Amino acid sequence: DFKNVIVVSAIKGITNDLITLIYKIRKDEKDKYTFLEKNIFNVNSDLAKQLDLDLSFLEEDYNFLRLIINSSYLNLKDETKIVSMGETFTAKILNQYLLKYDHLTEFFDAVNFIKCNQKNLTLHNNGNFSVEKDIILGKLANKDMVVIPGFRGINSDEEICLMGRGGSDTTGSIIASELQSIKYQIWTDVSGIYSGDPNKMKNVHI
């Protein structure tokens, strides 16, 4: 039987909003609470309403963000976690939606099996990544599919490392390569692909 590994990215714009939230926490701006509610929580709630889901399964993640905001203290370890939370939200929402229709699926965080060699964390690409194949295969042994948040892994100090922009595609490709997948598909929410770079060429078309 075929098994499916589903790697998701964040909802459009939410990673940028999480980065903005970090800046607001650093500067202790007064609107950091309303920004979190409007740009993060409400975006997830709108999606959940469309899917008829209760978002109680995100409460642990939400409490982490509330705790950070209330403390007004951030270290780089917290920041890398926050920046990558958009993918976590999407993966958990999708997994819950699949469970609703009785699919044998499980949310599985990439930090459980994607390792990076970087020690000095940044909010950008954190070095080389590798997949611990046996761990994900073990998870798939009793599931038809797993839903994984892209964009991140973990280093030997158990700190979250980021893959940089397009990190979810990178996550999918290295997993597909390591598992020697029969097929690797990238699904995206664009209406098409330009025939050339519209910023450099004239008369390009979709």
Question: What residue spans do the PLM features occupy?
Answer:
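Nucleotide/pyrophosphate-binding catalytic subdomain
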Residues: 1-206
